Amino acid sequence: MDSISQNDWLKAKIRKRDISYQSARGRRALRGVALIYLTVLLLIPLFVIIQDGLREGLTGLWHQVTLPIAWNALMLTLRTATIMTIINSIMGTLTAYALVRYDFRGKTLINSLVDLPLAIPTLVTGVMLVILFGPQQALGALLKEQFGISIIFAPPGIILALLFITFPFVVRAVQPVLLDLDRTQEDAATTLGAGSWTIFRRITLPPLILPVTSGALLSFARAIGEFGAVVIVAGNIPLYSQTAAVYVLGEVESENRLGASAVSIVMIAIAFGLMMLVDWLQHRKN
């Protein structure tokens, strides 16, 4: 009897070891597939463009980046992305607050429309803005004649396109936090006579700082590389409305691969730094 029990115990132990070995082998295979995919899809292209941009060293890269047209394109990209980020951080937070805290007719439709910019091709976004604000259109002509504001083929058009494309990021970053927020303190503050603005500023807003910042950084990173809508609305005018992404296309078409790679490296570095910061903020929030 004892011999049978011992044999069963040994068989069970062997089966458990085999299952554990197969599971470990499966995990290693899965990791290997993921690493190979990541290497082919992301790391090799990054390595190639960095190697190409640095083939004349840091001095050559700096020379290409500081050329007047390239530098102006980078600065315009950063300026328009910054303005867009400030506006969308405010409006995205207010939109998320309205969608979470208030019930109104058409709320479901508006909540669905928030994600529409992510689904629409950015070229279509550019065409819509040209049709609406073009110099030959009623609204575009009115803004130009009455206020001296040009939207299309000018920096304001770039900002408008970026506002449309990146609008969902802050809204979707803030909404889950508002949904999970305990409203006990807000109710207590209301009972004690605090006004709605005081409650929002002192109680509701502080927990939203991290998600708003994360959404803002994602918006900024997305805006840096935007091409489709910008190339339609900006007009690609050097030293005026040419962004970094459009400049890179021009350098590729001019067969100046070094210039295209150099500016691309700067854009990649900025985007990567922002993504690292977003990950850090997410980790801190969790």
Q: Each predicted region: which residue ranges?
A:
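Short, Lys/Arg-rich, polar N-terminal cytosolic tail immediately upstream
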Residues: 1-24
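C-terminal transmembrane helix and the adjacent membrane-cytosol boundary/short C-terminal tail
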Residues: 2-9, 29-33, 44, 48, ...
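Periplasmic/extracellular loop-to-transmembrane helix junction in inner-membrane transport proteins
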Residues: 16-28, 49-86, 101-102, 251-257
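Membrane-interfacial helix termini and adjacent extracytoplasmic/periplasmic loops
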Residues: 16-21, 58-66, 71, 107, ...
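Transmembrane-helix boundary motif in ABC transporter permease subunits
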Residues: 18-22, 83-115, 127-131, 142, ...
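Interhelical loop and adjacent transmembrane-helix boundary motif
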Residues: 24-27, 61, 68, 230-276, ...
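Transmembrane alpha-helices
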Residues: 32-37, 116, 120, 164-183, ...
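Hydrophobic alpha-helical transmembrane segments of multipass integral membrane proteins
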Residues: 40, 75, 79-91, 95, ...
